[in-house]
Amino acid sequence: VVNCRNVCFEKIDLRHSPGMGVYGLRSENILLKAVCTVVNRSEKRRFSCAADAFHFTNCRGLIELDGCNCNGQGDDALNIHGIYARIVAVSKDRKQIELFGVRFPAERVFKADDEIWPIVRTTGSRGARNRIERIVRKSSKRLVVALREPLDKTFREDDFIENASWYANVSIHDCYFGRANRARGILLTTPGKVVVHNNRFMTAGTAILIEGDTDYWFESGAVCDMDIHDNLFENCGTSASNNGGSGWGEALISITPSFRPADESSPVYHRNIRIRNNRILTYDRPLLHVRSVEGLQFVANCVEQTYDFPATAAQRQSFCLEGCRNVRIAENRFIGYGKPDFELIHMNPNN
């Protein structure tokens, strides 16, 4: 789905794809209603999709999943993100920059008249919006971009540019993310409004992963407003490593941007993430592994211990928090789980 608007897929079973099931790029308003990835056992298939079930890059408007069922994919159920392009040259007047798309062709991400954010590589912090006046293509991955305003002197070569015109609001509800997959549940990095509610997660890896990647995949989208509520998480994380690694995620919900805080005063990458009123059935300890979030809430959840699988996660604390601020963990019920414990890194006790 490329350069499209107002697209609906409804009541579709995807029984085999050699890659992703549904992929969207620079498209607006996409609805997936009762779209299911299903392993075709009659053809002796082992996977429904070789890669992600659903994947959306630099889309905007609303991406909605309603009543979808994801099983048997070779990678994640859903990934929604933008793209960082690296600044490789800046003109003397700072009104022209050269961009390099490290993992993704820059010409497919940026167009004339798009607004952009410059990003500090070392912190992930955004600068003021600017606008692309025109683009000269050097190759599919290299663009020379003329800006309306000079690039602020804070930014230089090896920093990044993110598209500020193309990012999505997201609604995911009444879906099932099943165990018969190799990787994680849903990956969400977008500054739009995100609501995840009334879903069932039985994922092999972490159920929800929120990143922001400036060192490998270069997937952008620092979160500003995310509400995860009234979901059922059931024995997620069975792909975790038993040899000290993190496997497919450190905890039930992992928030792990590339930026690593140096101390308690380091800037934060994500903001306003609320995890509330969920039911969590877990055979292992780690509930949250969170880095660089301001305004994190884990409130009014019910955590119930199961013994369906042996504990294998490398993280042995309930909550691992690094460089976070204004955190509230309260009013939760723990049934058979024992007392929750914490690992705090670069955290002020007042936070």
Please give the residue ranges for each predicted region.
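Solenoid scaffold repeats with emphasis on beta-solenoid/beta-helix
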Residues: V2, N6-V7, I12, M20, ...
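Short glycine/acidic-rich loop motifs that flank beta-strands on beta-rich extracellular proteins
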Residues: P18-Y23, N40-D52, G74-I80, R121, ...
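Ser/Thr/Gly-rich low-complexity blocks that favor extended beta-strand/coil architectures
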Residues: F104-K141
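Short, recurring structural edge motifs at helix starts
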Residues: D52-H55, D159-I161, A183-G185, T214-E219, ...
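Small/polar beta-strand repeat architecture
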Residues: R126-V170, D174, G178-A180, G185-L187
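Surface-exposed loop/turn segments connecting beta-strands in extracellular beta-rich domains
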Residues: C4-V7, R15-G19, S27-I30, V35-R41, ...
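Surface beta-strand/loop "capping" patches
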Residues: R86-E115
